[in-house]
């Protein structure tokens, strides 16, 4: 049997906007698409092969005279790395999901791995050149991303669908019932924590077009084109040809394919069999047709079978007596079948099990017969490993292929009866992927699927982040890679607080500004560089008075200066607050930068106050005003408008470092407030963050800033190796609660236990942060947790300016 039509697949513009008036050129283009769809006037046998009657815009498909179906697309969740309890919960919920469908609903699970959208993945990692001095770096970074993309299978777009079909007398009757089922399906997915959405008619047609055009090709279609052209939806999705005459193969366009079915022979199955088949890095389509048997009918059938087996047993016993041997000796198969039938009856009657009929189909497609046979052999090997057999559908290739498109129609009568829990073992969840487009940044490869991890922290409810890891685990490198990526593809400002002078090379290469704060006040070039902790701008707070928030900062600063267990007393705080308001009054009346107060002005104002506490606070400040640590008693003389600013505070020493970090944090807040007015994001990276959390007051201020950053367009990232110190702070829970992004690299044994409890990490996930190499770990993005690995190419200019390994820094 051979069905063939020779016409080119429709190609043209993407889905137009019907309300807009079409231009002459667009009308011409649409006319050409319709002309191509009409073909050469021969019988459209390829269209006739596709087994449905009509697709409606709302996503309902009329499959046969009385059968209607709808499709829901769903995403993956982390099943393989889940805690044992979570795995059990997912499995039980999936069993409940299957039990929801009664005998009147046919269910089809479809898993489509296709390489048709590799261009979209490459587009996501393409960094276009710009008119600046960084195109050589852009090219290098773009090439690195393309190489990483090639390592994974992001070119294989993995999609999951569930299609449910019912029989109804009319479209109206089908519509209301399908809507109820759709709502219940979405709610069931919600219970599983799975993101799902119903598909429109256009989306279902686009999906079918992708299946029938595995070599690619743009889908161009609009429902408004059907009436004037006299065409059906099939004309826009059918391939150039189908051939089914070879018995064991089919040909579709330029591709050759084969459909096989899974013979389930094993007494027990592993929950990885489906995921192993889907992990094959080849174009594969897997479909499970599941049909529930009416519970009463199933129980009656099994009881009849038990009765038949008992009759056979009695006959065997009579035969034994006549022959003169022990009547208890009966054929072993008979005893086994009887025992299994009774167990099955018990499952159905008392263990919340149902009976299902399952058809498991696997479609492989390739460019050549040899490649196809290799792909089929690989899939058959997985079946064999699980004591099953993958058997070719000889002379049923057409029915097999058409049963493998998500329409809800099963044309293959080969079915295996299974209980709910046996059916649920084909669990459709493996690992989540994180591949966003737009301004998404690269973080590494998914260690489970080898797919690229691209995500945009701005899409999170709370983009604040943490980078945690032991020395040598790749923390600083990961931060630098994120900075570079953000610098190249966004217009965000990037500010770094650098306590160890590790970022100079990268900042210099990106023409950023390094502000070196030291007790002498001398910068890298030997010229004075000062930052004024009293700096303020009129946008400093979202209310009318920016002074309240600034006063809070100065209280934190004074608390750090005074030190001691008790810190500032209520009277001290009152005195400081009064002095702050007095000092800023002239500047706020006339905001001239030359009138910006400095620490010395606060010192003098405190001396004017009558309370003895004021004199005590002033005495504590004296060291920082007129003493040897007076580096912060000057007006800011450095330009802070560069996109990339690094505050190098290594030379401040122990006495000034915490103070320096706090002052830098305040400078960043100033920048964030200015940028918000310009609708610009500010990324702030804080290395050795645990130092800020050691003092209660600086910790409280840091947490306050952490909370406030989000709605002001700030994206703070804390980097630390010292998790114990980080978690010793009472404020740290607020940091974790307000951070939807965590990059966790290798962890020490004690820290692992603490983090596992804090972030609810499973033992399987903890393996990825236990004795791992640099660049390996876990990424937490909202509710998504993925194991990642990043192997940045060492033979690049970027690697040389980003590495912090002493031997490599020397070479650079």
What are these regions (language model features)?
Residues 1-429:
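Extended, folded cores of ATP/NTP-driven motor/assembly subunits in large transport
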Residues 77, 84-103, 110, 114, ...:
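P-loop NTPase motor domains
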Residues 467:
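Hydrophobic anchor at the beta1->P-loop junction of P-loop NTPases
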Residues 475:
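Conserved lysine of the Walker
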Residues 478:
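Hydrophobic positions on the alpha1 helix immediately C-terminal to the Walker A/P-loop
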Residues 485-495:
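Post-Walker A helix-loop "phosphate-sensing" segment adjacent to the P-loop in P-loop NTPases
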Residues 516-521, 741-750:
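Conserved AAA+ ATPase "SRH/arginine-finger" region at the nucleotide-binding site
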Residues 759-812:
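Conserved P-loop NTPase
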């Amino acid at each position: 049997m051979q069905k063939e039509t020779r016409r080119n697949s429709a190609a043209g513009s993407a889905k137009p906007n019907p309300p807009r008036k079409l231009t002459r050129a667009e009308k011409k283009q649409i006319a050409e698409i319709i002309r191509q769809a009409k073909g050469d006037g021969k019988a459209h046998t390829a269209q006739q092969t596709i087994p449905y009657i009509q697709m409606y815009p709302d996503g309902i498909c009329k499959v046969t005279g009385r059968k209607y179906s709808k499709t829901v697309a769903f995403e993956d969740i982390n099943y393989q790395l889940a805690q044992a309890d979570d795995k059990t919960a997912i499995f039980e919920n999936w069993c409940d999901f299957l039990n929801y469908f009664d005998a009147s609903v046919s269910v089809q699970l479809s898993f489509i791995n296709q390489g048709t959208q590799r261009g979209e993945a490459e587009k996501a990692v393409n960094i276009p050149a710009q008119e600046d001095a960084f195109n050589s770096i852009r090219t290098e970074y773009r090439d690195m991303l393309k190489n990483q993309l090639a390592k994974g299978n992001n070119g294989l777009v993995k999609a999951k669908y569930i299609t449910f079909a019912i029989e109804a007398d009319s479209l109206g009757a089908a519509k209301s019932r399908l809507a109820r089922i759709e709502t219940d399906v979405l709610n069931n997915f919600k219970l599983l924590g799975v993101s799902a959405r119903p598909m429109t008619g256009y989306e279902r047609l686009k999906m079918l077009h992708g299946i029938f055009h595995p070599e690619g090709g743009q889908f161009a279609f609009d429902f408004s084109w059907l009436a004037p052209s006299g065409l059906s939806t099939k004309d826009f999705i059918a391939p150039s040809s189908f051939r089914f005459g070879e018995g064991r193969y089919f040909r579709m366009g330029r591709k050759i394919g084969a459909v096989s079915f899974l013979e389930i022979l094993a007494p027990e199955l592993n929950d990885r069999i489906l995921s192993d088949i889907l992990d094959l890095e080849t174009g594969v389509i897997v479909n499970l047709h599941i049909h529930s048997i009416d519970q009463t009918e199933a129980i009656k059938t099994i009881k009849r079978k038990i009765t038949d087996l008992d009759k056979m047993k009695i006959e065997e016993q009579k035969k034994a007596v006549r022959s003169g041997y022990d009547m208890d000796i009966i054929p072993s198969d008979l005893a086994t079948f009887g025992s299994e039938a009774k167990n099955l009856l018990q499952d159905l009657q008392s263990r919340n099990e149902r009976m299902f009929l399952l058809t498991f189909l696997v479609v492989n497609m390739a460019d050549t017969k040899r490649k196809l046979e290799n792909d089929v052999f690989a899939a058959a090997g997985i079946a064999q490993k699980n004591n099953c057999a993958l058997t070719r559908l000889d002379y049923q290739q057409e029915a097999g292929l058409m049963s493998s498109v998500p329409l809800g129609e099963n044309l293959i009568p080969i079915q295996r009866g299974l209980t709910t829990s046996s059916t649920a073992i084909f669990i459709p969840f493996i690992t989540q992927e994180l591949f966003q487009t737009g301004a998404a940044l690269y973080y590494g490869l998914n260690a489970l699927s080898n797919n690229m991890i691209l995500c945009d922290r701005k899409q999170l409810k709370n983009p604040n982040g943490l980078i945690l890891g032991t020395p040598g685990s790749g923390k600083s490198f990961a931060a630098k890679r994120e900075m570079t990526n953000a610098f190249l593809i966004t217009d965000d400002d990037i500010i770094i607080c650098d306590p160890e002078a590790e970022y100079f090379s990268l900042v210099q290469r990106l023409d950023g500004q390094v502000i070196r704060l030291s007790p002498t006040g001398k910068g890298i070039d030997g010229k004075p560089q000062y930052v004024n902790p009293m700096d303020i701008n009129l946008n400093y707070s979202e209310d009318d008075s920016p002074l309240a928030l600034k006063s809070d900062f100065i209280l934190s600063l004074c608390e750090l200066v005074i030190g001691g267990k008790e810190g500032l007393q209520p009277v001290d705080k009152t005195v400081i607050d009064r002095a702050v308001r007095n000092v800023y009054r002239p500047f706020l009346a006339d905001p001239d930068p030359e009138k910006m107060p400095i620490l010395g002005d606060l010192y003098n104002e405190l001396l004017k106050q009558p309370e003895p506490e004021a004199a005590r606070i002033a005495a504590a400040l004296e060291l920082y005003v007129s003493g040897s640590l007076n580096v912060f008693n000057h007006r800011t003389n450095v330009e802070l408008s560069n996109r990339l600013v690094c505050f190098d505070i290594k030379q401040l020493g122990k006495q000034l470092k915490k103070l320096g970090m706090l002052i830098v944090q305040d400078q960043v807040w100033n920048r964030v407030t200015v940028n918000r007015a310009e609708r610009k994001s500010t990324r702030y990276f804080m290395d050795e963050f645990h130092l800020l959390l050691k003092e209660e007051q600086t910790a409280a201020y840091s947490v306050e800033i952490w909370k406030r950053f989000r709605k002001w367009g700030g994206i703070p990232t804390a980097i630390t190796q010292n998790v114990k110190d980080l978690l010793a702070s009472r404020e740290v829970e607020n940091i974790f609660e307000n951070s939807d992004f965590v990059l966790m690299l290798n962890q020490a044994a004690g820290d692992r236990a603490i983090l596992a409890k804090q972030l609810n990490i499973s033992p399987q996930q903890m393996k990825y942060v236990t004795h791992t190499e640099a660049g390996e770990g876990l990424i937490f993005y909202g509710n998504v947790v993925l194991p990642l690995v990043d192997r940045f190419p060492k033979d690049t200019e970027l690697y040389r300016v980003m590495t912090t390994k002493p031997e490599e820094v020397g070479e650079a």
